[in-house]
């Protein structure tokens, strides 16, 4: 041991550094499970890597460096204008209208890059997976169109076909899917 202490405050001046075991990180004077892609955000603001009974999951972490999370609610068959309204007005237990938005193209790219991990978390939470893994769209198969918040110079809305990661744009009146996102 590098110090003999009767309580933590007595040790603070004696211990120069300490580390956590793998899968955990420091949080003040203790440790918590490390936040990772696919971790769950609960309505009380806590984050966990496992499903916790009697807690409500409201989001899944998409990217830790940009602190991006996506809703568990994937809204279907909205045109581009409806998608914007849906995302701006979206609420969950513990969040309010205006705290969510439609994803940018960069956000959709992060979702696509981490789709396998996110699908595992969605599936474990009892939610449909991204891109029709559980429900094949009759028109798009498993290459669903997900709207972004971005428009082109020609008035079309930018989107990503999540099956293959194709970036494209479509008439704003066409149907598609949207995923509200927020920073955590």
How does the language model describe each region?
Residues 1-3:
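Small-residue (G/S/T/A) turn/hinge positions that recur once per unit in extracellular repeat modules
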Residues 5-10:
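Tandem-repeat/low-complexity and Cys-motif detector
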Residues 13-22, 31-33:
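Extracellular cysteine-rich, disulfide-stabilized repeat modules
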Residues 34-100, 144-146, 155-159, 175-181:
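Extracellular adhesion/carbohydrate-recognition regions
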Residues 84-99, 105-169, 181-183:
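An exposed tryptophan-centered "aromatic clamp" motif
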Residues 170-174:
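Extracellular carbohydrate recognition
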